[in-house]
Amino acid sequence: ETDYIFNSILKPHQQDRILSFLGIISDPLGTDYNVNQSKIAIGSGGFLGKGFLQGTQIKYGFVPERHTDFIFCTVGEEWGFVGTMVVLALLCLLILRLMRMGERQQEPFGRIYCYCVAAILLFHVLVNVGMTIGLMPVMGIPLPFMSYGGSSLIAFTILLFIAVRLDASTRQFSLNNKF
């Protein structure tokens, strides 16, 4: 069953990514190249980073998808450990805020919606960061509100706008019922 999915459904480059991630094959100049360069970029950033637009791995094009899938390694090289922690902290605050909005909802739809948006954001953050540091196979999932790409930004913005609107209507409803 797994063989059928692996050989029939997945494309050859997807199979190579999975095999490379599992350590079955090693291709430092092919399948593993992006992840290896990403790890080098993040590691070379150190604690405070090299400075804005001063990252050598990024500046000289060693990381091919530095503005999309591997944006986190750009932050790691230019802003270091501190910069990556700030980005992760802000994304965590956003996720926690969405969960808090969900707790305030009086209708099941609003609660489920806010929790689902928080779960989607958490999934994207975990997969993207895991991908750039080599803990997950490369999947092409953007880092919310940071990766280049209009459709991702528009989709996440719409998800957040709906959640904020649901929260605002819940607050308005509770204010009207107090008086």
Please place each PLM-identified region on the residue numbering.
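Hydrophobic, glycine- and aromatic-enriched re-entrant/interface helices and adjoining loop segments
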Residues: 1-81, 108-110
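Hydrophobic alpha-helical transmembrane segments
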Residues: 78-95, 113-114, 154
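Loop-to-helix entry and N-terminal half of a specific, functionally important transmembrane alpha helix
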Residues: 99-140, 146
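Transmembrane alpha-helix boundary/anchor motif
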Residues: 13, 90-100, 121, 130, ...
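A juxtamembrane structural motif centered on a specific transmembrane helix
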Residues: 127-179
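Transmembrane helix-bundle signature of multi-pass membrane transporters/permeases
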Residues: 74-77, 117-121, 149-152
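Alpha-helical transmembrane bundle and helix-membrane interface signal
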Residues: 1-7, 12, 101-106, 163-177
